[in-house]
UniProtKB/Swiss-Prot annotation:
GO BP terms, alphabetized: DNA catabolic process
GO molecular function terms listed in the Swiss-Prot or TrEMBL record: exodeoxyribonuclease VII activity; nucleic acid binding
Subcellular localization: Cytoplasm
Origin: domain of life: Bacteria
Subunit structure, as described in the record: Heterooligomer composed of large and small subunits.
EC assignment: 3.1.11.6
CDD domains for this protein: ExoVII_LU_OBF
InterPro entries named among the record's database cross-references: Exonuc_VII_L, Exonuc_VII_lsu_C, OB-fold_nuc-bd_dom
Pfam families, alphabetized: Exonuc_VII_L (PF02601), tRNA_anti_2 (PF13742)
Protein name (record): Exodeoxyribonuclease 7 large subunit
GO cellular component: cytoplasm; exodeoxyribonuclease VII complex
Principal cellular location given in the protein's record: cytoplasm
Organism, as annotated: Corynebacterium glutamicum (strain R)
Keyword Transmembrane carried by entry: no
Length: 417
């Protein structure tokens, strides 16, 4: 097919044949040139009598892979044999085989990712996630005291699974587990663990999730430091416990998880309470409560006894009698003061009466004096005679003396000298 035909747009009336499509794809892919690509090896297919070997290189975070084709001598001449799960960097050129319509990366160099480089990348990821706040204690979720059901993600038939289940059952025989077995190393570990984590997180019966694995090399534990897994754990609504390796092992998952356990056995102890210890604690609390109650009763009894010994309770009439005596004494004082006051006032009244009597008309009459009144003939009130003109001869008079009055008549008047 001419280049003019190849560059033209395909139509229902003029479609491209398969060979042309593959040719165009091959030309486009080959323009990419040589590339360095990082991933994890899987499905290494090497035959002694083959000149070419075929491998699968998987992405370390997502379920994405690419086929590798390389000379068998590159694999055979390596100082250490390649194995599934190895983290490597390959150098190759993308190739598209037009006849079969398949894509592969033609590899001419395979280099293992060094331990130092791996650790540096892990630390770089750790710093970046810490800066985002994924390690912040404030975002850590508290574990339930007694979980209804425990989710467990671990390798099938692994020692970690046996340790978690046996220790948990010994501590609390009624504990229930929801176990999902996944790959715990290699290229498929991260996507399988993430899928299991999401399934358990969506299960309403699961109250806490344990991700457990036994010890291993740095390469073996790499899945638990992959960013995709850290993001999934941070997004989970259910508390997650990291129980990876042994005490010295510190994958990034330990920092992101809500709780880090030193070992799978330690995880079981941290998640499931010990029924024997709880019973002992209950007995101790019961004893403390009883002792506290007895102490309170004893203190109240002592306080009541002290109150009973008070005089007011020993003889309730004592304060009443005391108040009665005080009232009687006050009444006596009041009576005495009133009597004295009355007598004083009586003496004063008698003295005033004597003074009034001495100055009054009766006293004057008693000394021989008399009061003469003229009685008018018109029947009006008598008038005291003070002049001779008031009693002409023939006037009727009344003379008041000390012991009575005398009726008389005026016989005549005489002017004073």
């Amino acid at each position: 097919m001419s280049s003019e035909k190849a560059s033209s747009k395909s139509t229902p009336e003029a479609p491209w044949p398969v060979r042309e499509v593959n040719t165009q794809v091959k030309q486009w892919i080959e323009r990419l040139g040589h590339l360095w690509v990082e991933g994890q090896l899987a499905q290494i297919n090497v035959k002694p009598n083959w000149k070419l070997s075929y491998l699968t290189l998987r992405d370390v975070e997502q379920e994405v892979s690419v086929q590798l084709t390389c000379p068998t001598d590159i694999i055979r001449n390596r100082p250490t044999p390649l194995k599934d799960g190895d983290r490597v960097i390959v150098y190759g050129k993308p190739a598209f085989y037009a006849g079969r319509g398949t894509f592969s990366l033609w590899v001419t160099d395979i280099r293992p990712v060094g331990i130092g480089e791996l650790l540096a990348r892990i630390e770089e990821l750790r710093k970046r996630l810490a800066a985002e706040g994924l390690f912040d204690p404030a975002r850590k979720k508290r574990l339930p005291f007694l979980p209804n059901r425990v989710g467990l993600i671990t390798g099938r038939g692994s020692a970690a699974e046996r340790d978690v289940l046996s220790v948990a059952k010994d501590r609390w025989p009624e504990v229930q587990f929801e176990v999902i077995n996944t790959a715990v190393q290699g290229a498929s570990a991260v996507p399988e663990i993430i899928e299991a984590l999401r399934a358990l997180d969506q299960d309403p019966r699961v109250d806490v999730i344990i991700i457990a694995r036994g010890g291993g090399s740095v390469e073996d534990l790499l899945p638990f430091s992959e960013e995709a897994l850290q993001r999934a754990v941070a997004a989970a609504q259910t508390p997650v416990v990291s129980a990876i390796g042994h005490e010295p092992d510190t994958p990034v998952l330990d920092n992101v998880a809500d709780l880090r356990a030193a070992t799978p056995t330690d995880a079981a102890k941290r998640v499931v309470p010990d029924v024997a210890e709880e019973r002992m604690l209950i007995n101790q609390l019961r004893s403390r409560s009883a002792a506290a109650l007895r102490g309170w009763v004893q203190r109240e009894q002592q306080a009541l006894a002290a109150i009973r010994t008070r005089p007011v309770l020993a003889d309730p009439m004592t304060p009443i009698n005391r108040r009665r005596d005080e009232i009687a004494q006050a009444v006596g004082l009041i009576r005495r003061d009133v009597t004295h006051l009355v007598r004083t006032e009586q003496a004063l009244v008698a003295s005033l009466r004597a003074q009034v009597s001495a100055l009054g008309p009766s006293a004057t009459l008693a000394r021989g004096y008399s009061v003469v009144q003229v009685i008018p003939r018109d029947g009006s009130a008598p008038e005291v005679v003070t002049t001779i003109e008031q009693s002409p001869p023939g006037s009727q008079l009344r003379i008041r003396v000390a012991d009575g009055s005398i009726t008389a008549a005026s016989m005549g008047t005489q002017q004073a000298n």
